[in-house]
Curated annotation (Swiss-Prot):
Keywords: Carotenoid biosynthesis, Oxidoreductase. It comes from Paracoccus sp. (strain PC1) (Alcaligenes sp. (strain PC1)). The keyword Plastid does not apply. PANTHER family: BETA-CAROTENE 3-HYDROXYLASE 1, CHLOROPLASTIC. InterPro entries: BETA-OHASE-like, Fatty_acid_hydroxylase. GO terms for biological process: carotene metabolic process; xanthophyll biosynthetic process. The gene is crtZ. Catalyzes the hydroxylation reaction from beta-carotene to zeaxanthin via beta-cryptoxanthin. It catalyses: all-trans-beta-carotene + 4 reduced [2Fe-2S]-[ferredoxin] + 2 O2 + 4 H(+) = all-trans-zeaxanthin + 4 oxidized [2Fe-2S]-[ferredoxin] + 2 H2O. GO terms for molecular function: beta-carotene 3-hydroxylase activity; iron ion binding. This is Beta-carotene hydroxylase.
Length: 162
């Protein structure tokens, strides 16, 4: 039971970590060089932004190794990071950005809100004034629209994400 709680707690901490990294590193001067590719149109399967996933995968691999040989709790933390990575891949890369071989656009509920919130995140050109930096949690869409309108960066065609 303790190991399960470690995994669940790690998934929750990873959402906070991902929010922070996305907001202040990826959209900051330090990380925009990689993340910019994610905000630009392209016709290739991979983006420079995917290197962030490699960084977290390497970190999880190190934790798996150290946990297996020296400190077992790190193994369970690495498993939580891996579970979060899988959730991220399904929700962000798959559902929101359609990086899988079929197209599915959610029509209602949690997945719709997540989809719309991330569309609004991409409604801004450049790295400033974006909204909704989390990947599992998305603020209410109406609040995000208000924030974008207040900042003056929301284009009319982006007011109703599809």
């Amino acid at each position: 039971m303790t190991q399960f709680l470690i995994v669940v707690a790690t998934v929750l901490v990873m959402e906070l970590t991902a929010y922070s990294v996305h907001r202040w590193i990826m959209h900051g001067p330090l990380g925009w060089g990689w993340h910019k590719s994610h905000h630009e149109e392209h016709d290739h399967a991979l983006e420079k932004n995917d290197l962030y996933g490699v960084v977290f995968a390497v970190l999880a691999t190190i934790l798996f190794t150290v946990g297996a040989y020296w400190w077992p709790v790190l193994w369970w933390i690495a498993l939580g990071m891996t579970v979060y990575g899988l959730i991220y891949f399904i929700l962000h890369d798959g559902l929101v950005h359609q990086r899988w071989p079929f197209r599915y656009i959610p029509r209602r509920g949690y997945f719709r809100r997540l989809y719309q919130a991330h569309r609004l995140h991409h409604a801004v050109e450049g790295r400033d004034h974006c909204v909704s930096f989390g990947f599992i949690y998305a603020p209410p869409v109406d609040k995000l629209k208000q924030d974008l309108k207040r900042s003056g960066v929301l284009r009319p065609q982006d007011e109703r994400p599809s």
